[in-house]
Amino acid sequence: TEREISIVTGTGVCKALRKKGHNAILVDIFCGLEPVDWDEPFGDKDYEVDSAAEYMRSFDDAIEEIKRTRRSFFGPNVLELCQAADIVFMGLHGSNGEDGKVQATFDLLGIRYTGTGYLSSALAMDKGLTKKIFLMDQVPTPKGVSMLKENCTRNIHDLGMEFPVVVKTCCGGSSVGVYIVN
């Protein structure tokens, strides 16, 4: 899942940063972190990255319920920890990390973060729009068409294409909803 990829990414980055001497911790954007030792919010030398990752995974079965029943997108202490950090490494994958919403929130709150800004993230999340922008600037892209379900043709030859084709949802993450149709 995109959540698991995010946890794996964050774990690897956190370990690398800590190995280089940085005070880094893993924070689950949805479930947050409770309690927080505000005297040492970014962990001491004995901070266990793998234990933090397992703690995050412990919410996997309940994550949709947690998101549905809560008033805020962000879990407890997430924004406060991000504001206290020198910089936030964005390890989120999928719609919640790549669509520009988190980046826009961070921009509004003055939180420094890695990666692209909110506008480029939002534009790139829509693969059809991204393709149009690339084509306008003569960036080579594979042949493709965008269509809505209600306008979908059942005859691939009407589109000037032949099998096999790659079918991708327009606004999913980079590898979500990808199918090869023969």
Question: PLM ranges: what are they?
Answer:
Residues 1-119, 123-125, 129, 136, ...:
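ATP-binding N-terminal substructure of ATP-dependent carboxylate-amine bond-forming enzymes
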Residues 6, 142-146, 164-182:
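Glycine-rich phosphate-binding loop of ATP-grasp-fold ATP-dependent ligases
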Residues 20-22, 140, 174:
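Residue-level signal for beta-strand positions within conserved beta-sheet cores that form or flank
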Residues 84-87, 163, 167:
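Generic hydrophobic-segment detector
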Residues 133-141:
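Basic phosphate/pyrophosphate-binding loop/patch that engages nucleotide-derived ligands
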Residues 158-160:
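Acidic (Asp/Glu)-rich catalytic clusters
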